[in-house]
Amino acid sequence: LYPLIDADVLLYEIGFCGEYKDEDGEHKIREWEFVRELLDQKILDICEAVFNSQPPTLYLSATPKLVKQWNRLHSDNLEWKPNFRIELATKKGYKAQRKQEKPFHYNNIAAYLLATYDCKLAIGIEADDAMAIDQTESTIICSRDKDLKQVEGWHYSWPCGKQLAFGPTLVDKLGSISMSKGKIVGTGLKFFYSQIMTGDPVDNIPGLPKYGPVKTYNLLFDCNSEKELYDVVETCYKVVYGELWEKELREQANLVWMVRDMNGEEPIMYEFPNG
């Protein structure tokens, strides 16, 4: 299998391993060489866990700084543009609540990855979307991001802290959902449709009012086709929004959908079963 690695996750995971508090509670920064070795080893561990048959490609969500670095390295002329979801979100700002401080070595890690590994910059979309676009029968998405599990194909999540490893596992198109600690976890279209209902607090996506995880799970668990999933979700949106149901449903679906294809520079949105 050919690993597609979510480097957005590594920027933070490895970055925060590069700092600590000593016995006096003072914030300390580890040497870059320590962080670099940790990063290289993590990438190697991921590749070995999925029995890779060729070197990985690492995916990064573009920032203006990363685009400049890319252009210098590749004598390219890419132009940065923001994530398309920012413009789509009308109820809440997409990821507007995220105020996480970047680790000290964040930029060092990004620059090192671009200079050392085969990387792809996701411009106007997220690294997650770029990985979903490139997923084939011979690739495996390697990420700890739950959203990517809606994508059909091979998946692997490496362990980190209390988060256990997932896979390598083959996800089918319909997928499945289950309840874990009061939340819906799952794969494929079932997980995608559940997100349309519940939203995603991590990304500041509101979902459908008054449809939490338990209620949504009970409605979608027994669905055996894409059409059944859609019919349930459409009915619920009509109950809440009346004549505005289609607009509201489309917005939430476009926000949680992992893009699978592009039309030039524009992402192609999900097509519901009824068109």
Question: Over which residues does each language-model region extend?
Answer:
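Non-catalytic, usually N-terminal nucleic-acid engagement modules in DNA/RNA processing proteins
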Residues: 1-81
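Flexible, active-site-adjacent loop/turn segments at secondary-structure boundaries
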Residues: 8-9, 14, 82, 92, ...
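Short, low-complexity, polar/charged sequence segments that are solvent-exposed and flexible
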Residues: 21-25, 77-80, 96, 159-162, ...
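Extended two-metal-dependent nuclease catalytic cores across DNA- and RNA-processing enzymes
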Residues: 52-53, 89-274
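A charged helix-plus-loop insertion that forms the helical arch/lid used to bind
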Residues: 64-107
